[in-house]
C-alpha cells in the first residue's frame, strides 16, 4: 500500500484511470501504487485535488438536500441521476464514472434520507437537470 494507491482508491479510480488523470502511462501508475517507484508530488496533488472536488460537490449536494427538506419537508427518499459513462461523468466535472461514484457515496453515507440512484435523464427531475443550462 502506498499513498498513491490509497488516494486512488479513495477517489474511486482504477490504476488505469489514475494514470490517465496524472498524464502518465498505466504501468507508471501501477509502479507508484505498488511502491516500485515513488509517485511524484504532482501526481499526489492531482489526486488530492480530485478528492477535494468530490468532497466539495458532496457537501454542496448535502446542503441542497437539507435546504429542500427544510423548505418542503423531508421526503422518504431522494433520487440522484448517475452518469452512464465516462463522457457523461466528464461533462459533470469528474474524470470517470468511478470518480463520480466516490462523490455520490459520500452523499449517500451522510444523507438524512434514503438515496436512489437512477440513470441521468431517465426520469422527469434528472431530465430537467440534464436540459438545464450549465448542467
Regions found by a protein language model. Give the residues of each.
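Short glycine-/small-residue-rich flexible loop motifs, especially phosphate/cofactor-binding loops
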Residues: 5, 16, 105
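Helix-turn-helix/homeodomain-like alpha-helical modules used for DNA recognition
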Residues: 55-135
Amino acid at each position: 500500500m502506498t499513498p498513491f494507491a490509497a488516494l486512488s482508491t479513495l477517489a474511486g479510480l482504477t490504476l488505469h484511470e489514475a494514470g490517465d488523470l496524472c498524464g502518465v502511462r498505466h504501468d507508471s501508475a501501477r509502479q507508484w501504487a505498488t511502491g516500485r517507484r515513488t509517485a511524484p508530488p504532482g501526481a499526489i496533488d492531482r489526486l488530492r485535488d480530485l478528492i477535494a472536488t468530490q468532497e466539495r460537490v458532496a457537501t454542496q449536494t448535502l446542503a441542497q438536500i437539507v435546504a429542500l427538506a427544510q423548505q418542503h419537508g423531508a421526503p422518504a427518499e431522494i433520487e440522484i441521476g448517475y452518469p452512464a459513462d465516462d463522457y457523461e461523468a466528464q461533462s459533470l466535472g469528474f474524470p470517470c464514472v468511478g470518480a463520480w461514484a466516490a462523490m455520490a457515496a459520500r452523499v449517500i453515507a451522510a444523507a438524512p434520507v434514503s438515496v436512489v440512484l437512477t440513470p441521468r435523464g431517465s426520469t422527469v427531475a434528472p431530465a430537467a437537470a440534464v436540459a438545464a443550462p450549465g448542467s
